[in-house]
Swiss-Prot record:
<dbReference type="InterPro" id="IPR003016">
    <property type="entry name" value="2-oxoA_DH_lipoyl-BS"/>
</dbReference>
<dbReference type="InterPro" id="IPR033753">
    <property type="entry name" value="GCV_H/Fam206"/>
</dbReference>
<protein>
    <recommendedName>
        <fullName>Glycine cleavage system H protein</fullName>
    </recommendedName>
</protein>
<feature type="modified residue" description="N6-lipoyllysine">
    <location>
        <position position="65"/>
    </location>
</feature>
<dbReference type="GO" id="GO:0005829">
    <property type="term" value="C:cytosol"/>
</dbReference>
<feature type="domain" description="Lipoyl-binding">
    <location>
        <begin position="24"/>
        <end position="106"/>
    </location>
</feature>
<dbReference type="GO" id="GO:0005960">
    <property type="term" value="C:glycine cleavage complex"/>
</dbReference>
<comment type="function">
    <text>The glycine cleavage system catalyzes the degradation of glycine. The H protein shuttles the methylamine group of glycine from the P protein to the T protein.</text>
</comment>
<dbReference type="GO" id="GO:0019464">
    <property type="term" value="P:glycine decarboxylation via glycine cleavage system"/>
</dbReference>
<comment type="similarity">
    <text>Belongs to the GcvH family.</text>
</comment>
<comment type="subunit">
    <text>The glycine cleavage system is composed of four proteins: P, T, L and H.</text>
</comment>
<dbReference type="InterPro" id="IPR017453">
    <property type="entry name" value="GCV_H_sub"/>
</dbReference>
<dbReference type="InterPro" id="IPR002930">
    <property type="entry name" value="GCV_H"/>
</dbReference>
<keyword id="KW-0450">Lipoyl</keyword>
<dbReference type="InterPro" id="IPR000089">
    <property type="entry name" value="Biotin_lipoyl"/>
</dbReference>
<dbReference type="InterPro" id="IPR011053">
    <property type="entry name" value="Single_hybrid_motif"/>
</dbReference>
<dbReference type="Pfam" id="PF01597">
    <property type="entry name" value="GCV_H"/>
</dbReference>
Amino acid sequence: MSNVPAELKYSKEHEWLRKEADGTYTVGITEHAQELLGDMVFVDLPEVGATVSAGDDCAVAESVKAASDIYAPVSGEIVAVNDALSDSPELVNSEPYADGWIFKIKASNESELESLLDATAYEALLEDE
């Protein structure tokens, strides 16, 4: 079973979301997602300043197996991207919940968080796959 940190929120598309002290949200892909994709070779990051809607594809993770879209779990403005992934995309594999984060978003509609899964619900989703 994949590691599913209790403090995070999750999307059905296997992104995770963590609220930061400054009110922004850090987004990445889950350990389960990176296990399915395999070794990362490139991450196509979104543009800082871009406005996205929940469910929009805004980044791409390319692995030795496949390229997979990464979706915005909430609507808002991209305020930062993880530039370290340009040189070290494998951070998504080795540290999916830490240094392997993909982007930060300033949510424009925090009520969208209610549609995300908590750790228990995400674990149940994984068991059903």
